[in-house]
Structures are given as C-alpha cells and as structure tokens.
Amino acid sequence: MTCMNPRGHGALRAFAHPTGSAFVIVVAATIAAHVAALAQNLDIKRYNPSEWTKGRFSEVVTVTGAGKTIYLAGVGAEDENAPAGASAPIRHLGNPYEQCRYAYDKIKRLLATHGASLADAVKQVVYVTDVRFQADVAKCRREAYGDGPIPANTFLVINALAIPGMLLEIDVTAVVAK
C-alpha cells in the first residue's frame, strides 16, 4: 500500500492498516512496552573473584533474563592469587602455549562458578602479541574445547597487552538456560 508523505507524494511504501495511523501508534506502543518489560526483567551482575582486579574492571558479567549471558573480561596468564591493588604477575613468561592453557583453566573455573562450561561459549576473541603464536593457541584451544562445540572466534594480533609479559588474552561470552 502506498502512504503519502507530508507533501502529498506517494513515494513512501509502508505497511498500512485500514484503521490508519492509530493502528501504527498502538503497535509501536506495544513494542515499546514489551522492550521495557524485557529490560526490567534483566538482572546484570558483576564479579571479581581475583582480588587484584577489584575496582579495575569486572572479570565476569552475567545478564539473566530468558537465559543468562556470561561475559568474561580478557583472561590471560595473570596470577589470580595476586593481592588487591597489585599488578598481577604473569605465569609462564615467554611461553604462549602454557599461557593459553593457564588462561583456559581460569576460563573454565570462571564459567563453572556461574553454571556454565566451554560448551556454553558462543563467542570468543583471542588477542595475541605475535602472529607466530597462532599454532600454539590453535592447539591449546582444540585441547580446551575437546570434542565439544566451538564458539564463533576472532583472532587478533595486537602490539601489547595490559601487563608486560602477557602474550595472549581471551574474551569469552557464554549463554546458559535460566
């Protein structure tokens, strides 16, 4: 159906209902109310299991609504047992494969704390400081996921990470049923 624009030209095409613009307003209001209701039913929580990260960033963010979405901050080989306010020492200096294994061990523990596993991961981003680490990271990732589902993945080579000695960092997003 052709709808006239304010100048009387019939150039705009849109869905129109016999009752006219009142119907469009009702539909728009219904959609807005539904979106507002969904937003009110979301519960967003932030967690910092490692003392040294408190006040710096959230290590894990969960969003619960129809399901629960879990967002992990970049996980690397930072020692999670470092004291609050300190820069965490890096484990396995100079060894991208071992840093990756350590990162996935931490990721598994963080996800488990929130009722998830790597099988629930839907997206991950891997940051490395040298493209030559790709083979080590690919091997480590295959070992971490095993025969389970593999999430959408982005692999990025960057100049540096937040703490000297970090060779890689992995962001993971997972979704679990409520």
Label each region the model flagged.
Residues 14-21:
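N-terminal polybasic/positive-inside topogenic patches
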Residues 23-105, 109-123, 129-178:
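N-terminal presequence-like segments and the immediate start of the first folded domain
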